[in-house]
A protein has these predicted regions:
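Hydrophobic alpha-helical bundle signature of multipass membrane enzymes
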Residues: 1-42, 62-68, 81
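Membrane-embedded catalytic cores of phosphoryl/pyrophosphoryl-handling enzymes
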Residues: 36-140
Length: 140
């Protein structure tokens, strides 16, 4: 049980990192002109925004794991709200600083959200299977 949060974070972060690396290699999109950017300058391809994709996945997974421990709706809404604001602030900063095009961060948020759906659904499915196995063994 204690390994589950670590495993979720490793799977989530590993998947988002893989999407970032593969996306940058396949698309190989140039970044905005350096005259538009704030130093230090990035040298890797622009698409997708790795900062946005990885931050979104990690922060939202942390929010999900914290929400699993909370019982009240107010606390859960606050946790999710903070996670969303932090993730969107990262996305906005990448465009504002001139390191990415808007589409780089929008696609990163979309890819990250899709990956979160897969990871969280897998976790919920595993919890359901475990609960049903426990109920079946208890009723026998």
């Amino acid at each position: 049980r204690r390994l589950t949060p670590v495993l979720l974070m490793v799977i989530g972060a590993g998947g988002s990192l893989a999407m970032t690396v593969i996306g940058k290699q396949v698309i190989d999109r140039a970044r905005p002109a350096r005259a538009l950017a704030v130093p230090p300058y990035e040298t890797s391809p622009s698409f997708p925004s790795g900062h946005t994709l990885n931050t979104w996945v990690i922060v939202m997974l942390i929010g999900y794991l914290v929400c699993l421990r909370l019982h009240g709706l107010r606390g859960r809404v606050a946790v999710v709200g903070v996670a969303v604001v932090f993730g969107l602030a990262m996305a906005a900063s990448r465009v504002y600083l001139g390191h990415h095009w808007l589409t780089d961060v929008l696609v990163a948020l979309t890819l990250g959200s899709a990956w979160l759906i897969v990871v969280v659904t897998g976790h919920r499915l595993a919890l359901t299977v475990k609960r049903r196995q426990h109920e079946a063994s208890s009723s026998s």
